[in-house]
UniProtKB/Swiss-Prot annotation:
EC number: 3.1.13.1
InterPro entries assigned: CSD (IPR011129), NA-bd_OB-fold (IPR012340), RNase_B_OB_dom (IPR013223), RNase_II (IPR011804), RNase_II/R (IPR001900), RNase_II/R_CS (IPR022966), RNase_II/RNase_R (IPR004476), RNR_Ribonuclease (IPR050180)
Domain of life: Bacteria
Keywords: Cytoplasm, Exonuclease, Hydrolase, Nuclease, RNA-binding
Main location: cytoplasm
Gene encoding the protein: rnb
Subcellular location as annotated: Cytoplasm
Protein name, entry field: Exoribonuclease 2
One GO cellular component, as annotated: cytosol
Domain S1 motif residue range list: 561-643
RNB domain: residues covered: 189-516
GO molecular function (one): exoribonuclease II activity
First-level EC class: hydrolase
Length: 644
């Protein structure tokens, strides 16, 4: 008699609409219970039995119950699952398999089976890619996944690389394909093979894409010719090789090895500007005044060059600093180094006054054994030879940005607009509390941004600089010319690494159209999105492999008294993150290691400080001594404590 009763249906509807609900993200804990985080201020308790229906990171709608003034959440509807495609370790044997996701907060094994078409017989410890198929909030009894790809076996020494590449769905090897002959591009190439071009790189570099040649003019000004490898002389737009490069967008540099954007035959040989080999190149000639100003008369042209020497950063730096035994092989090469050094000094001086110069940070290089074991981690400071190349490349990219803007009105530009306008007032208020007075409008201009950066660089520590970083916008890739506030330049378009950046290949094609005086279509917007996404994934992959190798390297230091100098890079409610100065490893210091009495401790992310009993004891950019308390290999996390 109650069936199809409209009154009953109405009552049900009423009860449903009156029950309080909340949407948020599930945060798991190691103790079985969890929280529904609605926003930064509000969260609801999820009891252990209800946590069985959800997973850490799921976005859900939950019913809010109140019992004895205590609120709790009952998951009701799945908005967006946290896990879709993931990597993990297989447990069990073929008949009863499960997989534990490789994630610090996901500990539960998920029942699974090999997807149709996957031939591998999975066994305990195998690494695999899986895709979620069932979820309790979708009406299923439990979680369930399909194993869609075998990655590698448990004891493979190269697990960090293969698992990371699979996690981010990135290629494991160089693209296939060969280029048999150069294209007829209708370009007249200037023969510069007699000139003393040199390359300066790391000793191990094979994909040399820039060569430099300098000469002094009669009036004392210096003329710099930057010759860049020319892969678009071999690769036609829209060809199979071009499409593969477009998808990869960049060469992926990981500790120990790289996965090139182009076939190795091209990247390391045919296009690489090897010493004493004749190569096609795209070149830019510019004249630099004594004060570092680049003359408006910039020439781009196609050329043929022959590098006369493969120079190595450390050798060139030692020679310029009068150290070591290395000598240039002849006076012609020595003269090149001297002239390039002069160009570097004048351009650096110009950028200090008219643009911005980054503070030098060392590069950290992993020294690996045959089996991927970390033998050492070496901090490689940026020396004078690195700066010679850097200044030449920045000058060349500035020239390309101007030429593309003035001749075409588009290109592949690196754009950075400084501070987000929405943050300008908060930024000015924060700076005021530290005694720096800026105009909220002016700081949004290139000139105002540069002025502020110079004031910050003059501060005794980088503390204030670290505080305002959160107000900055991110650098973007755009087809529209625009300023690069981070470099302090009116426009910046890279074309100097076409072997390893697809955007630079596009700019080569655009510059060639300018050289020939031909019209050319504007690049599609979707290519900039692909490049930005690939850059993000490659950076995450580099960080993930690095975390794994750092954990391996520091594992035997856990629980010892070995001290490391560490810079505080971030403070959060739970403690602080530090970077070990000698090797670049990131470690976490939990709040209880800072002070035993929680009520007397205030860790403020907002202020970047740690206060104990009202006194600021630590702040971001401080360098302190730490010891390694623990290394958690399963999550690749390093726990440190302040040294006693």
């Amino acid at each position: 008699m109650f069936q199809d009763n409209p009154l009953l249906a109405q009552l049900k509807q009423q009860l449903h609409s009156q029950t309080p609900r909340a949407e948020g993200v599930v945060k798991a804990t190691e103790k079985g219970f969890g929280f529904l985080e609605v926003d930064a201020q509000k969260s609801y308790f999820i009891p252990p039995p209800q946590m069985k229906k959800v997973m850490h990171g799921d976005r859900i709608v939950a019913v809010i119950h109140t019992e004895k003034e205590r609120e709790s959440a009952e998951p009701e509807e799945l908005i967006e699952p946290f896990l879709t495609r993931f990597v993990g370790k297989v447990q069990g044997k073929n008949d009863r398999l499960s997989i534990v996701p490789d994630h610090p907060l996901l500990k539960d094994a998920i029942p699974c089976r090999a997807a149709r078409g996957v031939q591998h017989e999975f066994k305990e410890g195998d690494w695999a890619v899986a895709e979620m198929r069932r979820h309790p909030l979708k009406g299923d009894r439990s979680f369930y996944a399909d194993l869609t790809q075998y990655i590698t076996f448990a004891d493979d020494h190269f697990v960090p690389w293969w698992v990371t590449l699979a996690r981010h769905n990135l290629e494991k090897e160089a693209p296939n394909g060969v280029a048999t002959e150069m294209l007829d591009e209708g370009l007249e190439r200037q023969d510069l093979t007699a000139l003393n071009f040199v390359t300066i790189d790391s000793a191990s570099t094979e994909d040399m894409d820039d060569a430099l040649y300098a000469e002094e003019l009669a009036d004392g000004r210096l003329q710099l010719t930057v010759a860049i490898a020319d892969p678009t002389a071999w690769i036609a737009e829209g060809s199979k090789l071009d499409n593969a490069a477009k998808i990869r967008a960049f060469t992926n540099y990981l500790p120990g090895f790289n996965i090139p954007m182009l076939p190795r035959e091209l990247s390391d040989d045919l296009c690489s500007l090897r010493a004493n080999e004749v190569r096609p190149a795209l070149a830019c000639r510019m004249i630099i005044a004594a004060d570092g100003t680049i003359d408006d008369d910039i020439a781009f042209f196609a050329a043929t060059i022959e590098s006369k020497a493969k120079l190595v950063y450390d050798n060139v730096s030692d020679w310029l600093e009068n150290n070591g035994t290395w000598q240039p092989e002849n006076e012609g090469i020595a003269q090149q180094i001297r002239l390039l050094h002069r160009i570097c000094l004048s351009r650096s001086e110009w950028r200090h006054h008219h643009a911005l110069v980054f503070k030098d940070r060392p590069d950290y290089r992993f020294v690996l054994g045959e089996k991927g074991e970390v033998l050492d981690i070496v901090a490689e400071p940026r020396r004078i030879a690195n700066r010679i190349v850097e200044e030449s490349m920045i000058a060349a990219n500035l020239c390309a940005a101007r030429v593309l803007r003035d001749k075409l009105g588009f290109g592949i530009y690196n754009v950075h607009t400084g501070f987000d306008p929405a943050n300008a007032d908060a930024l000015a208020a924060l700076l005021k509390t530290h005694g720096l007075h800026v105009d909220a409008e002016e700081v949004l201009t290139l000139e105002g941004f540069c002025k502020l950066r110079r004031e910050l660089d003059a501060q005794p520590s980088g503390f204030l600089d670290s505080r305002i970083r959160r107000f900055q916008s991110f650098a973007e890739i755009s087809t529209e010319p625009g300023p690069h506030f981070g470099l302090g330049l009116e426009a910046y378009a890279t074309w100097t690494s076409p072997i390893r950046k697809y955007g630079d290949m596009i700019n080569h094609r655009l510059l060639k159209a300018v050289i020939k005086g031909e019209a050319i279509a504007r690049p599609q917007e979707d290519i900039t999105q692909q490049m930005a996404e690939r850059r993000r994934l490659n950076r995450m992959a580099e960080r993930d492999v690095g975390d794994w190798l750092y954990a391996r390297f520091l594992n035997d230091k856990a629980g010892t008294n070995t001290r490391f100098a560490a810079e505080i890079i971030d403070v959060s409610r739970g403690g602080m993150r530090v970077r070990l100065v000698d090797n670049g490893a990131i470690a976490f210091i939990p709040a209880p290691f800072l002070h035993a009495v929680r009520d007397e401790l205030v860790c403020s992310q907002e202020n970047g400080t740690v206060q104990i009993k009202g006194e600021t004891v630590y702040k971001v950019t401080d360098v302190i001594d730490v010891t390694i308390a623990e290394v958690r290999m399963e999550t690749r996390s390093i726990i440190a404590r302040p040294a006693a």
